[in-house]
Amino acid sequence: MVAKGSDFETEIKEEIIVAEPRRFKVILLNDDYSTMDFVVEVLMVIFNKNFDEALGVMLKVHNEGRGVCGIYPYDVAETKVSQVKKKAEESGFPLRAILEEC
């Protein structure tokens, strides 16, 4: 931007700093009732994992009690958690997902 005066011109520079959005991990938690097939389906449908990726995350959830499904900005991560909850309730499973800030 240029400001004009009677005898001079002054250039004013504006610096805009854009911060990176905070990122959140969506984590599936193991339970004793959700089937392995259902967890793989959730990972493929909601998190767009291919079969091999979904199988790997499902096994991590099964063996370690939790597994990271993906890392997203807050609004996307929150939506994914809600989608997991809805699909689990509709299917009669107690599968849960949580958020953790990276």
From Swiss-Prot:
Q: Which Pfam families match?
A: ClpS (PF02617)
What intrachain disulfides are recorded? none
Biological process (GO) annotations held by this record are: protein catabolic process; proteolysis
Question: Domain of life of the organism in this record?
Answer: Bacteria
Q: Where is the signal peptide?
A: none
Q: Which InterPro entries match?
A: ClpS (IPR022935), ClpS_core (IPR003769), Ribosomal_bL12_C/ClpS-like (IPR014719)
Q: Which SUPFAM superfamilies would you find in this protein's record?
A: ClpS-like
Q: Which family does it belong to?
A: Belongs to the ClpS family.
Q: Report the function annotation for this chain.
A: Involved in the modulation of the specificity of the ClpAP-mediated ATP-dependent protein degradation.
Quaternary assembly: Binds to the N-terminal domain of the chaperone ClpA.
Question: Can you say what this protein is called?
Answer: ATP-dependent Clp protease adapter protein ClpS
Lineage, broadest ranks: Bacteria, Pseudomonadati, Campylobacterota, Epsilonproteobacteria, Campylobacterales
GN (gene name): clpS
